[in-house]
């Protein structure tokens, strides 16, 4: 772990260089479209570690865990929903090793793939409980902060922030994806 906390580093106005894409790198190492990327945290841990070490060697100051699809909802599509905590904890431990003593680990929370009521069938409480399972695994593995990536729905983002905040007081970074529509953005 770094001597200065991630929050302190950001408060001081320091630039924080993140790593690059994980999915494309895993594909270059043999991941197929039918494989679960997060399962590789257990079955191909050395491959994930090598990728993350390469990012550190290239100058990355923070490693993002291989958990973009690490919610029980996404993992369930591969038959791994019951291994949510295991896959997330393994990912955080791998990233922690790659980050070394002076790097940071960001626990990655991606979109759940669920559509919230009233437009879909998912309710906020179910979503929150699922994300909290992911968060607990990431905390067990030793993350320094969380990054919520490419969420399209403000309500899902709110639920994700609440789920993380219910389990931890670590910093939360967020990014959203917007689509251009005729009358602006969505």
Show which residues each predicted segment covers.
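Domain-level signal for soluble alpha/beta catalytic cores
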Residues: 1-186
């Amino acid at each position: 772990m770094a001597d200065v906390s991630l929050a302190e580093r950001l408060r001081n106005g320091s630039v924080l260089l993140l790593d690059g894409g994980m999915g494309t790198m895993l594909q270059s190492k043999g991941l197929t479209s039918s494989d679960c990327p997060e399962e590789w945290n257990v079955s191909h841990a050395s491959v994930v570690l090598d990728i993350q070490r390469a990012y550190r060697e290239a100058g990355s100051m923070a490693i993002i865990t291989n958990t973009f699809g690490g919610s029980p909802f996404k993992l369930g599509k591969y038959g791994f929903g019951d291994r949510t905590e295991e896959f997330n904890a393994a990912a955080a431990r791998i990233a922690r090793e790659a980050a070394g003593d002076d790097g940071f680990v960001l626990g990655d929370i991606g979109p759940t793939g669920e559509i919230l009521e009233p437009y879909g069938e998912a309710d906020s409480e179910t979503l929150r409980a699922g994300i909290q399972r992911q968060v607990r695994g990431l905390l067990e593995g030793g993350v320094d902060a969380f990054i919520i990536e490419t969420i399209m729905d403000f309500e899902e983002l709110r639920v994700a922030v609440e789920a993380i905040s219910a389990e931890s007081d670590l910093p939360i970074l967020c990014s959203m994806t917007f689509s251009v529509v005729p009358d602006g953005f969505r």
